[in-house]
Amino acid sequence: HKTSSAASDVYKRQAMSFKDFYGVIKMPKGVLIGLVCQFTIMPILGFSLASLFNFPLEIAAGIILIGSSPSGLASNVMAYLAKANIALSVTLTAVATLVAPIMTPFLMKTLAGSFVPIDFLAMMTSIFKIVIVPVLLGLIFNYFFHGKAKWLDKAMPIISMAGIGFIIMIITAAGRDDLLSIGLLLILAAIIHNLLGYVFGYWGCRIFGMCEQDCRTIAFEVGMQNGGLATGIALEMGKISTVGLAPAIFGPWMNISGSSLATWWRDKEPKKK
């Protein structure tokens, strides 16, 4: 209940607006370190796990895909719960989303190109359609109408959660045969991928001398990915039942682990630098 109410609160207060990008000017070090961690740690971990577990090629590509995606709203919710730097979290999510049309296809071409054919331009176009166009429309809507359609502010988190649940059901049904044969191994890989993302994200920031609040923030930004985007890309590739499996498993798990970590951190006041 605490997590769902926080999600609604963060959505209403942090629905993407032009203000979210001011953090690039106010916190350039945190944004730069966060982006570097975001687009190195998880893609490399994904490639390593896909190779180590020797998954079928399209399943392996799905693991790399979820690792190569930007963070999503869930990381903002967890940062809020964990008393982390919510402003940095929102800015990182916004900037990572905007650079995703270049970074995600580049990482997929580089790391997953040996598993499945990757069309850079087609994937870039897909990401524009799935994320960038809705984000731009959301920015415009938020600028002109935020607070004027309160029923929409309340409805959107519910609609989003219902939509995600429906998509996961479709992927699970479509990938039933693969799930029965490698499901447990894929769940294990998703858990390792996610947990190591938190660990490397947190300690990577520690190495650069970031404060505790910022380290917590970037741990969530790195460990929690935009499963909806990864699923959309898999659908556009026509491989929802294979490439889409890893994002479908990673998404629910990251919310469980993220909530647990956020609750644990919530009771521990961030140490001052």
Please name every model-derived segment.
Residues Q14-G23, L73-A84, L139-K150, G201-G209, ...:
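C-terminal ends of transmembrane helices
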Residues Q14-G23, L52-F55, L111-P117, F141-A149, ...:
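Transmembrane helix-loop junctions in multi-pass membrane proteins
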Residues D153-A155, M210-A234:
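Helix-helix packing/entry segments at the starts of transmembrane helices
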Residues C37-M42, S68-A74, S89-K109, I127-V131, ...:
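Membrane-embedded alpha-helical segments of transport systems
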Residues M42-F47, M103-A112, F166-D178, G227-L245:
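Hydrophobic alpha-helical transmembrane segments in multi-pass integral membrane proteins
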Residues D20-A50, A60, L98, T125-S126, ...:
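Entry/N-cap segments of selected transmembrane alpha helices
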Residues H1-A7, Y11:
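Single conserved hydrophobic/aromatic residue that forms the stacking wall/gate
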Residues P28-L35, F55-S68, A84-A94, D119-M124, ...:
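The feature identifies polytopic integral membrane transport proteins across all domains of life
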